Every structure is written in structure tokens, then in C-alpha cells.
Amino acid sequence: MPFSADSVTSLRQLADALAARTVSAEELAREYLARIEQAAALNAFIHVDAELTLAQARAADERRARGEAAPLTGVPVAHKDVFVTRGWRATAGSKMLGNYESPFDATVVERMAAAGMVTLGKTNMDEFAMGSSNENSHFGPVRNPWDAGRVPGGSSGGSAAAVAAGLAPAATGTDTGGSIRQPASFSGITGIKPTYGRVSRYGMIAFASSLDQGGPMAHTAEDCALLLNAMAGFDPKDSTSIPPAQGGVDEDYTRLLGQPRAGATAERPLAGLRIGLPREYFGKGLSADVEQAVRAALAEYEKLGATLVEVSLPKTELSIPVYYVIAPAEASSNLSRFDGVRYGHRAAEYRDLLDMYKKTRAEGFGAEVKRRILVGTYVLSHGYYDAYYLQAQKIRRIIADDFQRAFAQCDVIMGPVAPTVAWKLGEKTSDPVQMYLADIFTLSTSLAGLPGMSVPCGFGEGNMPVGLQLIGNYFDEARLLQAAHAFQQATDWHLRRPAKA
């Protein structure tokens, strides 16, 4: 019987099949390329180049034949189109960069290529990572594989949909205010945002530099740990990358997987783990179906030996206005480079240089990006800087301190990723504030720079996936992954697939 990726439930199984020569990297790449073509209606990918992909796959097979294979050699991966890539376009989902091809690879792309992984293509995303539904892309919205009439989440919606639909076994994403965790939740997959500075931002098209962080998206916690091993590490080319002296040491993120905590048993592997439940995450605004799935997951953790402890994150509600002051301010600065002079879109007709600037930016940016540039420029302007931007930064510090007080009472914080399941396409596009409110449970983690992840924990309204959010202290990814892996060993939510996939 010929090999099929449908029989594989994890990257380790895929890697084992490649190592055993059950399937070649080229055969695997061809299978996934065919799937991408068949599922074009999902609009998960912006750019696919079969020749480039197959060339990488053949190189991976040759590397294995020479006995030089790494653990992930030959494993396919899709890259969010915010990472620049040689050969493939790098658009950030925008008309402004519609035909841009980078002369270099982002560090994340470079490191995964060095591990022997094979690029399947570039995934769709909200323009410049600004959005929670993947409806802001210049290349059209991505559809959720569980229900094509609903959003997959954003801004890494293309990556989430690609993994959920079986178009890629793994993908990269970025998380500025929840853009890995929320689409992972909406699409029924696993995703992790590492501690800010763990993964290099070099070659990642910037939205908000003090918040943007790359991370992996896949089916399981073990998959994400393997991918983090390839992605993470200090990068001298990124000034925000954490050097070893400050905690950014290389580590094996799989080292605690399947290991009981000290003093625990195989039946209760998480005995002694204190799980903090923020009371602010379980109040008004959380839909009953999401709360039911999250509570059931927490009960499963109790069976695994963990103890539930109530904690407080009192500034949770303020995370929305704080984020939507700081992030647009940084975007206003970062996106000023797109002016039509050096690269990207340029207006076809203009009178002079100033007219070219105006027309280029008016034509090149979408409505949501323009909105955030305007907000960001306003809060940075003379007379408003102290009232808005400076105040937001002060509250950001308080939010980070609140987390540290909570971690004095617990080891890991858990709760919902989003207040609801994925909504219908077009349902919130006319009301930006309602769209922003969907990020209330993920923004504070990003503002504090903490690691956070989403794991599938059930289904809600319309049989749509629900994600459980796990938040750890700085550099505590291994413990987060251990807790997520233990849950996935005891449940099968991560094995569920959309019927049409």
C-alpha cells in the first residue's frame, strides 16, 4: 500500500517514515503540493512554486543518502508570508509588496532550511499582520477548513488553515497580539508564541517591533517543540534577540515531553503543577460553549494531578486600549519605509515626489492598515504623546508586573484563547472594535513578552474548534510544552480533522 500522509499524526512519525525510506522527501513534497492545488478554494497560500519546492526536496533526499540528515530533514513546512524568502515572493499580504522578492532569507527560514526542511510555499495572512480574521489580506480572505463560511483567525490564518486542512504538516506564524494562538484555536491545531526575543525577527516584515514574535504551528505540542528546536536561538542580526547571558540559551524543547514532574507518577504525571485561572478570563463576555470546553480541559488536568488556583490579572480589560496605542504607534514608524522609492508598489501616475508618496501609500495599503497608521501617528504626535503613548507604556509595565504576582501563586496560567469560536466571514468587518475585542485574552501575554500557546480542547457552537490557552513565565516554554503534551496524551482533540480535509 503506497504511503499517505493521512496516516501520520505527528512530525516525528513523518520524520521516522523519511528515515526508514518508507517515503522520500520528493514524494512527500509532491503529495502536499497536490493537496494545496486541490484545496485552492481555502485560499491558504499566496505563492507556491513547485519547482523550487521539489528542488529542495531532492536536496533533502541527497543529504539523507550521504548520511547527513537532521531530525527534520525532508519534512515539509509552509512559511507565513511575513518572512522574507529567496525565490518566493514576500508580500506581507499587501498590495504594497505584491511583487516583492527578497535577496535573502529570514533567519527563521534560513534555520529551518539548514535543518533540511522543505518549503511548500508562502501562506496567506492579514495585511502586515494587522487583523484577527484573515479578511484583511490583499489576496482575499482565507476560509476555515472546518466551515468554509467562517474565518480561520488571524493574522496567521493561512498557516493555521494549511495545517488544519492537511496542506502542510507544519507552518510558521507570527504573534503580535495573538496571531499564532487565536488562529490555532479557531482552526483546531496547536501553536506556540515563545518568549519575546527567543526567535529571531531578522527578515520578518515588521508590524510592531516590541511585540512581534515568530513561532511554530502544527498538530501537536511535540511537533511545536521539534520546530522550536530548529527555529529558536540567539541571532546577532536581530537587536531584540535575547543573548545567552540574558537567558537566550539554546535548549532542547522536547526534553520534558512525556516526563513526569519530580515526585509524580506515570498515572498523575503533573502532580504538583499549580495552574492559575485568572478570574478576569472567566467572566462576562466569555461564551458558554467556549467556557464549557475549557472547564472540561481543566478537569482533565486535575485528573493528571495538577491543582487549580484562582489568580487575578486586574488590568486585562486595559490590554485592548494599551495594545491599540502601542502597536499602531510602532506600525506608523515601521511602515513609513514603504513609499514607492526603493521597492514595492509605486503609483503609475504622479506630479512630483510628494504626490508619488501620497498616491503610492493610498493605493498600496488596505483600509485596516491605513486606520492603524493614522491612530499610531496621532498618538505619537506633539501634545498627545504623553497622554496616550507614554501612559500606555506605563500600564504595559503594570500588566507585566501583574503576571509576576500571579506566577508567585502558580506555575502555569490557563484559560480560553478567545471569547468565542470562529465567526462567520464578514460578520465583524464593519465594526473594527468588535474585531479588536476578540483578542482580549491574548493581548496581555504579548504586552508582557511571555510565552503562550493554544492547544485544541473541544468544540463549541457550529462544531467549531475551541483552544485552551497556556501561559508560562519567561523562558518557560519547555514546561508549557510538557503540560500541553501531557494533555494531548490523555485526550484526542488534537487528532480530530475537518471532514473535508
UniProtKB/Swiss-Prot annotation:
Q: Which GO terms describe its cellular component?
A: glutamyl-tRNA(Gln) amidotransferase complex
Keyword vocabulary terms for this entry: ATP-binding, Ligase, Nucleotide-binding, Protein biosynthesis
Ranges in a coiled coil: none
Query: Which GO terms fall under biological process for this protein?
Result: translation
Q: What is its EC number?
A: 6.3.5.7
In terms of domain of life, where is this protein from?
Bacteria
PROSITE patterns the record matches: AMIDASES
PANTHER family xref list: GLUTAMYL-TRNA(GLN) AMIDOTRANSFERASE SUBUNIT A, TRANSAMIDASE
Oligomer status and interactors: Heterotrimer of A, B and C subunits.
Q: What does this protein do?
A: Allows the formation of correctly charged Gln-tRNA(Gln) through the transamidation of misacylated Glu-tRNA(Gln) in organisms which lack glutaminyl-tRNA synthetase. The reaction takes place in the presence of glutamine and ATP through an activated gamma-phospho-Glu-tRNA(Gln).
Name the HAMAP family on file: GatA (MF_00120)
> Under what name is this protein listed?
Glutamyl-tRNA(Gln) amidotransferase subunit A
